[in-house]
């Protein structure tokens, strides 16, 4: 749903085929059978496998993959491990690693409303210029998350998905890579993205003005100013 505005915008869909899917445990996708006997933890391997399985099931021929936040991190891993499978890769709000700045134990406790605390955690990452309606739509998506899912996602983001010392192996001659980060993002800061980009010869990087951690949902119109030129360059 975070990409729904791009999916509904003729400026995008008249030229490009756009597919977005809910990961298992997220949105309208259910957890795997037997989920009640396990603790959900997203890993680099399982996330990478899910993206590649979707592309295979849809019979996509070297698609362009774009992801944001943890989705941006997995895009970097796709560039590291599977670059030849893609026409281009776009990582939004992405870096090889971010130092944790919050306590994830608060995200799954019986005495705390999980959805509301998740939304509270990320609310400050939205740029002040973002429309009020779009801001609260973005927060609502986090309020609707299943118990422990955001905490499990952050296991990948904070622990398992550490790509330091790995991104320097990315070869943009095989697959072009674009990094775009909002200036108001203090989770993945512009400095984090620029530090990562400095290790990747040939990468194209841009800091997006008046945007935060969720550009495609917090201010879709502003995001189009940045993403449409990238798509045009790829096409």
For each predicted feature, which ranges?
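The serine-hydrolase catalytic nucleophile loop
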Residues: 1-7
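Active-site loop/oxyanion-hole signature of alpha/beta-hydrolase fold enzymes
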Residues: 17-66, 225
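Gly/Ala-rich beta-loop-alpha elbow adjacent to hydrolase catalytic centers
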Residues: 67, 71, 75
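Flexible "cap/lid" loop of the alpha/beta hydrolase fold
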Residues: 76-117
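Short beta-strand/loop motif that positions the catalytic acidic residue
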Residues: 173, 179-181
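Conserved alpha/beta-hydrolase "acid-adjacent" motif
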Residues: 186-192
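Catalytic active-site module of serine/aspartate enzymes centered on a nucleophile-bearing elbow/loop
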Residues: 203-235
């Amino acid at each position: 749903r975070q990409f729904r505005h791009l999916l509904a915008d003729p400026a995008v869909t008249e030229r490009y085929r756009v597919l977005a899917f809910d990961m298992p445990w997220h949105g309208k996708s259910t957890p795997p059978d037997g989920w009640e006997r396990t603790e959900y933890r997203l890993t680099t391997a399982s996330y990478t496998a899910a993206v590649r399985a979707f592309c295979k099931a849809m019979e996509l021929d070297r698609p362009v993959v774009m992801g944001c936040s943890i989705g941006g991190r997995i895009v970097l891993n796709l560039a590291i491990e599977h670059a030849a499978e893609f026409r281009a890769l776009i990582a939004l709000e992405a870096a090889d690693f971010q130092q944790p700045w919050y306590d994830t134990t608060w995200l799954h406790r019986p005495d705390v409303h999980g959805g509301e605390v998740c939304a509270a955690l990320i609310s400050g990452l939205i740029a002040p210029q973002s429309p009020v309606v779009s801001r609260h739509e973005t927060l609502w998506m986090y309020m609707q998350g299943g118990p422990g899912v955001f905490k499990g996602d952050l296991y990948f983001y904070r622990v398992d998905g550490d790509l330091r010392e790995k991104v320097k192996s990315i070869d943009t001659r095989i697959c072009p890579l674009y990094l775009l980060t909002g200036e108001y993002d203090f989770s993945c800061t512009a400095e984090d993205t620029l530090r990562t980009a400095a290790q990747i010869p040939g990468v194209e990087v841009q800091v997006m003005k008046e945007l935060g951690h969720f550009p495609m949902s917090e201010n879709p119109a502003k995001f189009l100013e940045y993403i449409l030129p990238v798509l045009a360059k790829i096409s």
